[in-house]
Amino acid sequence: MALSGNCSRYYPRDQGAAVPNSFPEVIELNVGGQVYFTRHSTLISIPHSLLWKMFSPKRDTANDLAKDSKGRFFIDRDGFLFRYILDYLRDRQVVLPDHFPERGRLKREAEYFQLPDLVKLLAPEDVKQSPDEFCHSDFEDASQGSDTRICPPSSLLPHDRKWGFITVGYRGSCTLGREGQADAKFRRVPRILVCGRISLAKEVFGETLNESRDPDRAPERYTSRFYLKFKHLERAFDMLSECGFHMVACNSSVTASFVNQYTEDKIWSSYTEYVFYREPSRWSSSHCDCCCKNGKGDKGESGTSCNDLSTSSCDSQSEASSPQETVICGPVTRQSNIQTLDRPIKKGPVQLIQQSEMRRKSDLLRTLTSGSRESNISSKKKAAKEKLSIEEELEKCIQDFLKIKIPDRFPERKHPWQSELLRKYHL
């Protein structure tokens, strides 16, 4: 039986033809300006996800998707974080770098692409710790086998914890030629490195600290990747000194290498580190200062002085406060120096030693003053001798010049310029 042109053939569902796939095997994506190449099977590996809906072969949606000028499928999302989405689509796992700062943004991308399992993997890291809990020290220190000490978070630390170490290091170089050359290149410091606790480094250097190599770190953590925006060591030392730091150690290593085999110039390169430390404020001297101001300067009828009052006040305060915050001042033993006409005081061994020390100091002072006077006199004599020597040299020059005799008549010269010169000066 023949069928008319308006009739169409019926295919049952189990025997129907498969819907052709309009997507190529390798798909080129443009995600926020970043270009990615991936397989079509990777994009549709997780059912009911957004990428599965976009690139599913059951619907012909290839013409509905946005494309850029080069025909690549365009997705208006973060191109940097999309690499982790692709990693998860490949093997259901994602490996993030250490101290990854954009975990929250990656979680938002996973929610957008409708990947619930990836959202669960990223969710536990977003839970904030309560203030009563403690956090461990740096993961880098723990991985290197250091002591895993437990330290409280920055919110629980006392406000006056401002003590610690800061290490300042630099790699410098200088070129020195032969002695007497003026074109020698002096010290060159390309970069000043800063190591230590982040809170201390920010307190000392402030806006001059470059944190681009180690950003988004807690203030109580330690770093060795900060450096300063200026190149003057003395400026860094001044800033450390103004904040109460003093240098406790330093080390340096120097190497020399020739510029080339034809010259004697040497390039000296060195790496130097300076360790600075600021001590904690253990006690305050305000109470003792107040007692000294209120007390009498001279001894009164009771025989007590300002020092006695200050020591007694310090003793009373040391009993009330903790031993870590105060310094206990011991009692001051004083000897009575009462003298009468009937009974002269015998000089003890201590007084004899003190007198000998005073004599020794006076003798040393005399020798120093006499030495300085002699040096001044000798310097004046040397200056006078130098002046005389200059005058003598001038006199010798004048005498030598007077001894020069110019002949009345010069012999004839062979060259014409010589005769012209003689005629010019009428010789």
From Swiss-Prot:
Phosphotyrosine (modified residue): where? 112
Q: Which GO terms describe its molecular function?
A: G protein-coupled neurotransmitter receptor activity involved in regulation of postsynaptic membrane potential; G protein-coupled neurotransmitter receptor activity involved in regulation of presynaptic membrane potential
What does this protein do, in the record's words? Auxiliary subunit of GABA-B receptors that determine the pharmacology and kinetics of the receptor response. Increases agonist potency and markedly alter the G-protein signaling of the receptors by accelerating onset and promoting desensitization.
Q: Which residues carry the post-translational modification Phosphoserine, per the record?
A: 130, 137, 143, 146
User: Which SUPFAM superfamilies does the entry link to?
Assistant: POZ domain (SSF54695)
The primary site where this protein sits is membrane
**Name of this protein:** BTB/POZ domain-containing protein KCTD16
| CDD domains, per the entry | BTB_POZ_KCTD16 (cd18398), H1_KCTD16 (cd22219)
Q: Where does the BTB domain start and stop, copy by copy? A: 25-98
Give the matching InterPro entries: BTB/POZ_dom (IPR000210), H1_KCTD16 (IPR049903), SKP1/BTB/POZ_sf (IPR011333), T1-type_BTB (IPR003131)
- Name the keywords, alphabetized: Cell membrane, Cell projection, Membrane, Phosphoprotein, Postsynaptic cell membrane, Synapse
Q: List the SMART domains hit by this protein, alphabetically.
A: BTB
Subunit note: Homopentamer; forms an open pentamer. In contrast to other BTB domain-containing proteins, does not interact with CUL3. Interacts as a tetramer with GABBR1 and GABBR2.
Look up keyword Protease and say if it applies: no
Q: Where in the cell is it found?
A: Presynaptic cell membrane; Postsynaptic cell membrane
Q: Which Gene3D superfamilies match?
A: Potassium Channel Kv1.1, Chain A
For this record, an example GO cellular component is: cell projection
The free-text tissue note of the record is: Expressed in the brain, mainly in the hippocampus.
Q: What GO terms in the biological process aspect are recorded for it?
A: behavioral fear response; memory; protein homooligomerization; regulation of G protein-coupled receptor signaling pathway
